[in-house]
Swiss-Prot record:
Entry's EC annotation: 5.4.2.8
Organism expressing this protein natively: Dictyostelium discoideum (Social amoeba)
Positions annotated to bind Mg(2+): D12, D14, D209
Chief location: cytoplasm
Biological function: Involved in the synthesis of the GDP-mannose and dolichol-phosphate-mannose required for a number of critical mannosyl transfer reactions.
Catalyses which reaction(s): alpha-D-mannose 1-phosphate = D-mannose 6-phosphate
GO molecular function: metal ion binding; phosphomannomutase activity
Subunit structure as annotated in this protein's UniProt entry: Homodimer.
Disulfide bonds: none
Entries under Pfam families matching the protein: PMM
Name the record gives this protein: Phosphomannomutase 2
Catalytic residue positions: D12, D14
């Protein structure tokens, strides 16, 4: 069967294709390969390219028609690089320094059960802020997620940063278990859509877990170009929906 080149299915990574920061399963890889014989497929993750590669595999840029890291600020088509955006050019070094200094002071004064390291991760198109620190263990990551749900550590921090830096033109997006992303307004996951021409792609599907307001899948899930979005809770949920929607006879 020939591939329908006018239809594409876009996938988030954590809690959609994989468990958070875990490797993709063979079952998921096989189903995606089967789906790719029907339509084009793409991945759009908030993480940087190397982190997505750790989860989806060394050869992942050849397993998808499109790969969008950092919301599409790093974009690949058919295994070839299309674009790399740069937050340094947008904000300038002085503003970046002011922002990071404020974040580090805030985290230093934050009273949470544990802290580890890498509270600010500088990426090409965004800053990733983690109150607990990105190099916490998987168990600590899961414990922080529960703590954050109750105590609203991330959402409170986002509110304070929005007020403090309202002139910077920044957008904030809570994703994953332990962090949130900061990037120029419009550089959310909808950014990737500019690489999918409207005259070429007529039907677009999106699968993601953080589709709620403030989540890093919200903007793309609700974008007018998305034909249908699917809110999922786990890779198992994604598998079930894919089988039911695309393969059920």
């Amino acid at each position: 069967m020939s591939q329908n080149k006018n239809t594409i299915c876009l996938f988030d990574v954590d809690d959609t294709l994989t468990k958070p920061r875990n490797a993709i399963t063979n079952e998921m890889k096989e189903l995606l390969a089967s789906l790719r014989t029907k339509i084009k497929i793409g991945v759009v993750g908030g993480s940087n390219f190397n982190k997505i590669k750790e989860q989806l595999g060394e050869n992942f840029i050849n397993d998808f028609d499109y790969v969008f890291a950092e919301n599409g600020l790093i974009a690949y088509k058919d295994g070839s690089l299309l674009e790399i955006q740069d937050i340094k050019k947008y904000l300038g070094e002085e503003n970046i320094k002011k922002f990071i200094n404020f974040v580090l002071h805030y985290v230093a004064d934050l009273d949470i059960p544990i802290k580890r390291g890498t509270f600010v991760e500088f990426r090409n198109g965004m800053l990733n802020i983690s109150p607990i620190g990105r190099n916490c263990s998987q168990q600590e990551r899961e414990e922080f997620e529960k703590y954050d749900l109750e105590h609203k550590i991330r959402s409170t921090m986002v509110s304070i940063l929005k007020e403090e830096f309202k002139s910077f033109g920044l957008q904030y997006s809570i994703g994953g278990q332990i962090s949130f992303d900061v990037f120029p307004i419009g550089w959310d996951k909808t950014y990737c859509l500019r690489h999918l021409p409207e005259d070429e792609f007529k039907t677009l599907y999106f699968f993601g877990d953080k589709t709620f307001l403030g989540g890093n899948d919200y903007e793309i899930a609700n974008h007018p170009r998305i034909t249908q979005s699917f809110t999922v809770k786990s890779p198992a949920n994604t598998l079930a929906i894919l089988n039911d929607f695309f393969f059920k006879k």
